[in-house]
């Protein structure tokens, strides 16, 4: 605001001074003319013809032809189809990262693509503007005046300005696009700044067009640039430092793509919340009053039947073709192919012929970033991270132009480590344990579990690129099995009580996946009316509802305070409490078997701690799933008249059963590690530093079993005592008195963590003292959390007063450690009571990550 105001003042000052110029010009003009007389004035004239300007340049013919001036290092772009109004046809514009950072924390992965944007080139005299159209606000009216009114009501965005360098008599123009192709279109600098990695900017002297990967095709033009981002900061951010040879200069490649828009025969399909798709939306200001302003359609690929009247086993004019990255090694490559190919089952169930959905290895020499290829890429990173599926889509219709799957290679290594921790397969080498000699891949249970996971992961992320959203109810509703859930490995105990990995992950596409593809991709016979088609689509979902299938997605599953009893990440089974008991039994069996046989001979013994992390916390996500029964509400994405059930409070008996199971995760028997494990864990040796994947420690270099227990307890307490859950417990107890009350939950937690085995003088008692302190801290935090209702905060404060009263009135404990612990609790509560408004709760003890590292919001 201030900058614009100053600029206006400068313009006015210049205008004012211009009034004084004529006299000065009369005085100095003859002198100037005399001084310039020996040289002829430079004629601006019209720009040269394109053929003359580009003579000797390397020409790349395509949608937007390119001309490379190797001597000057300039790349020219030809615009051949400017209309009488000076505007080109609309194009789809995207950018991407062919070369990434390899950092989950930075989130700038190899193969990452941007959203598609509708752009056009506009000429105004010697200028060419690249204009992004505003597709968020539209008019479907046939009246040009109505459409113009909407267009003029909202801004467009001029992304770049060029100067005409040459033109031809047919109206084609040539522009120097070098600076455009060398700018940071992907927003790398902004990303680094937002992540506090430093102020990076492009160094033009260290950036250039990457001509080897710059191409022009009839339907798309691809320009790649090697960009070097530099910073003057003395200590660049750690994330950049982790992955870059010199953190002061990070060199990446960015790709700019101009793509011909698809033909207009694609029919958008309406978005319905319970159909399981991502929406593409815009506002239509021509809709009648009373009708929705926001128009929502699903994202999906184009499929056209060869026979318009075919009903079943219909052949497609152009099947949906995906390719797997040639950089994926075997046996990973075969697993990716197999898992992604599962989707053909769903397309067959939706009336298409076998082979309508195809997956093959990317042809040798093919460019995975080319928009013509739907790609499944194998990406390496510094730490394990998320895999994800993205799509470049036509903003006008929601048609998917390019599916782009990114699969992180370290996921498989993490799963292999989990399998090793569960089974401890490396017996004494002198005993001739065959695994040490190298199992055949088909005989290695850990490898088979990993490959099963990779098949499922390939199917899951490919599903996103077909337009499908997560269905986080699938794993807990038996009729709704789906690859679009996050599966926890279904580890079981065999008849002898040994760990069995053979059923860890499901095979093939699920029942819900077939429903979703049926809704999104079934094509009806020619001449089917729009109303009849809508009825048929509604019937697909109604039949799924009747079969007991449920769709619940991210917004209702990810928050710690979410209420849905079936929507969870990394869980299994229709009965969360029973499954938690089963998972705890598997965990106990694996811990009893855990020891040096979990690592190969020659591995530092300290690596056992890394193996122990996923095993000790094996129950963490099933615990979350079980907690969501408590203060839970069962609901669907209802539409009026669809016949779905109304929301209902979870049965009180189920809530109490869940609470009983959850409290076991706070019990000393669960959280105390045996001496047989503690005696094996040395500090880390040189070359093997502790990382974020290690347990927290209050004991310096040594393994800290107390901190490990605190971190596990806080995982439970954070979800159980979430402010939204606490507030719902009050409401639901008033509506259904048999439901657990907030006060009852608090009392149950306090009773559990007050348990002291062996009269308080034992390792398990020390663990539980730490857990009790964490529980009180969690309650104090809830008591001052403004997100909780006032009554919830009041009830928690009342309970804290009860704790204080009990601590100060019961006889002093005989055990010295217990007496000291009690005094510390009293001091902490008194600190809170003296000034609740100033009280700062201690943060939870952070457990090592269980999910892949990085931001999970988009995955």
What are these regions (language model features)?
Residues 2-3, 16-21:
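Positively charged n-region of N-terminal signal peptides that target proteins for export
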Residues 341-352, 463-464, 468, 489, ...:
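Sec-exported extracytoplasmic/periplasmic mature domains
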Residues 360-380, 452-508:
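The catalytic-center signature of Zn2+-dependent metalloproteases
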Residues 8-13:
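Acidic, Ala/Val/Gly-enriched low-complexity intrinsically disordered segments
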Residues 37-328, 346, 353, 361-415, ...:
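Auxiliary tRNA-acceptor-end handling modules of aminoacyl-tRNA synthetases
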Residues 22-32:
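Bacterial N-terminal signal peptides
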Residues 112, 326, 330-338, 370, ...:
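Soluble non-cytosolic domains of exported or imported proteins
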Residues 475-859:
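Conserved catalytic/binding loops enriched for acidic/polar residues
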